[in-house]
Regions:
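Periodic low-complexity repeat segments enriched in small/acidic residues
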Residues: 30-34
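Intrinsic-disorder-associated, low-complexity terminal segments enriched in Asp/Asn/His/Tyr and depleted
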Residues: 15, 27-28
């Protein structure tokens, strides 16, 4: 499912060798201010054919198509992606690396951003500010060659929908999401469906007490090892095939939400 996006005739790019630091030092906005240059806050993504990268920036201006920015040629640029879900269908078959160059980029939705990027191998979203993000379903759905991911360090405290976030990511081996903040997550169905090489997530450290839909969350995760027995699921209602095909996943206590509390009758005799 594709969400609308707008591409512009202007662009620019950084060293998008994913999971490696940029050749530009620090945040572009900060560098500009240190030099006494007043810079507007522009947020955009740049695709460069040089290394098939897609890089997200917060910078004072948007470079021109065909020029060089941070050592790479600008092939295409995308704007206005912060307030709605989007996907770059035109380049989805080419991108091999995704990275966020600057801090201060605060998308309200991440749903389907990289859906079906079939050649994507690495993604570094660590600098993305997801403090106020509310939806992230299908973020890396059907990225079958994705091997490395760095998730936003801010967690996703307001995200209610994470369904199919890593659906079909069959090459992904590990996610460093220990202690990750998914407190508001309600719909987590098929979140890791078919992640057959995934070995560790850190899910056992999560607090997802608001979760309702957990259908097929770890379906087919045959190499995953997670002990979820400590999860407190007070609101769950759906858990069909939660960990089918994932023998290393120890399920939560599904009876927890339905345990009846015995209330003792109040003894009023002492006050009479």
């Amino acid at each position: 499912m594709a969400c609308p996006f707008r591409s512009s005739e202007t662009i620019s790019t950084i060293d998008s060798a994913v999971l490696r630091p940029s050749r530009l030092l620090g945040n572009h906005i900060a560098v500009g201010r240190e030099k006494g240059i007043e810079m507007a806050d522009r947020q955009f993504a740049v695709y460069s054919v040089d290394d098939e990268s897609l890089t997200f920036y917060r910078y004072g201006r948007i470079p021109v198509l065909g020029t060089e920015f941070a050592g790479k040629h600008v092939t295409k640029v995308f704007e206005n992606f912060n307030d709605h879900c989007w996907t770059t269908d035109a380049i989805a078959d080419r991108v091999t690396g995704v990275s966020v160059a600057d801090g201060g980029i605060k998308p309200r939705k991440l749903c389907h951003w990289f859906n079906r990027f079939k050649n994507l191998r690495a993604a570094d979203l660590e600098k993305l500010d997801t403090t106020y993000t509310t939806a992230a379903q299908g973020l890396f759905e059907s990225c079958g060659n994705l091997e490395q991911v760095r998730m936003p360090r801010f967690g996703m405290p307001l995200v209610a929908d994470t369904n199919r976030m890593f659906y079909g990511c069959k090459s992904l081996k590990r996610l460093g999401m220990d202690g990750y903040n998914l407190y508001s997550a309600v719909d987590l169905h098929e979140m890791f469906f078919g992640c057959e090489r995934l070995r560790k997530i850190g899910a056992e450290t999560w607090n997802i007490s608001r979760a309702v839909d957990l259908n097929r969350m770890f379906y087919g995760c045959m190499n995953l090892s997670e002990n979820l027995s400590s999860w407190t699921l007070e609101n769950w209602r759906e858990n069909a095939r939660f960990s089918t095909g994932a023998p290393g996943v120890i399920d939560p206590d599904w009876d927890y939400a339905f345990t009846e509390t015995v209330v003792k009758p109040l003894d009023l005799s002492m006050g009479i």
